[in-house]
Amino acid sequence: MRERIPGIIRQTAASIESIPVAEKQAYDALAQCIGENGPVEDHTDSTLLGELFRVKLARSCRQGLHWHAISWWLAENYEYFLLDALHASLKRPDQPDDLFWYLKKRGLEGALPLFADCAAPLVDAASQTTALTPALFRLALLRNLWGNKADLSMSGGVVSQKELKSDSANLLLLDDIDAVYEYYCRERVTAVTIMADNTGFEVLCDFLLAALLLHFNAALCITYVVKAAPVFVSDVTLPDVDITLNAMAASSSGCLLSSCSSLALQWIASTLREARQAGRFVPVASSFLCTAEPGWNMPLSLAELLDRQGQQGLLISKGDANYRRLLGDLHWPYDTAPKAVLEYLPCAVLVMRTMKSNVNIGISEEQQTRAAQFDAKWDCSGKVGMIQFYHWRVCNNHNNCRSRTRSPPASPPSCTPSPGPSSG
């Protein structure tokens, strides 16, 4: 809160073309208030998103709390609500509605040629087989996982090309790829919901995975859930979906791409557009994913979507913020069994994230030791990844079935709100 969040606010203001001095000062004032632990003020409105913040903000204001005293999860999400409101009040007619548009545009332009080189071999492999093989499934998930490193909210708006493309300096701590592939094939999954995370390189990886799944499974429908408002700098919103698809489809005009790479991008874009026309690829926006609410408080519309998927469904949760939401942003003991927390979900869940906060479950002491030997800040550095699969009808040994419960998990006494990244 002292450095990273104020830095993001100032970086965002600096990215706005021809920003007047008065506008820049308004952004600076918000950054200074948060960085210097100013009082929390209730600026919620009558919008759905404002209503979702109202109770928590009213409670904080009644208690006279300052920015560094409220939970990090609330502070971080509310900060983006205030940023959006500030942008809306200052926006000129020639400016985009998304205040992070300039940063996102730069990120997409840099990511396209790098992603195309990574995607071309997978698209080529898909053209040479009639079924989604375990090897191709694994490659697609790994590409998708490490694409999560491209998070502008953690980097202050800058992600290096080397970081986007390299997998060699990373550690895959939890690898449930074989388990989810077995479930996907055995249950003949027909419905997948993807909770999206970042634009740029990561959304390109999402689209690659979605295109491959749709290509090999004619009965499959994918719901792609994005944020209803711009948050966390690079998070995907509905306009970003078409912006990205258009950029991929127009890739032949880019002189930096080989014909093979360009064709791969065009195949992904055309596959998703055709699926979208047929109602098999459906992007939807969620205000709930822009709030500090825990997963077990998800609105009925989202809960019913997952409930309808049932035994033939799969929820894919992308990134750190969505994972924190599923766990209520509580600091569970790292070796907590996933079933103790995730039983409220009505369908199977696959988590793919690079670890950027100390909110984790399902990590044994042995795995924690291994991770610490790899990186002293392994749970916050973004260099350690997890592909974690859980289903309420499957125990850890993937044998015995049991009944599920839709009630919130019971927090153990040692379970506390997450203090946020060590970098502050």
Task: Provide a role label for each language-model segment.
Residues 1-191, 388-396, 410, 415, ...:
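Non-catalytic accessory regions outside enzyme or core folds
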Residues 17, 204-207, 363:
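Short, glycine/acidic-enriched capping/hinge loops at junctions between secondary-structure elements
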Residues 72-74, 195-205, 229-231, 320-325:
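Gly/Ser/Thr-rich loops at beta-strand to alpha-helix junctions
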Residues 186, 190-192, 201, 211:
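Secondary-structure-rich domain cores
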Residues 190-191, 219-223, 348:
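Residues at the starts of beta-strands that form the adenosine-phosphate
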Residues 191-193, 313-314:
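Structural motif
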Residues 202-223:
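Histidine-anchored nucleotide/phosphate-binding helix
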Residues 226-228, 234-424:
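C-terminal functional extensions of proteins
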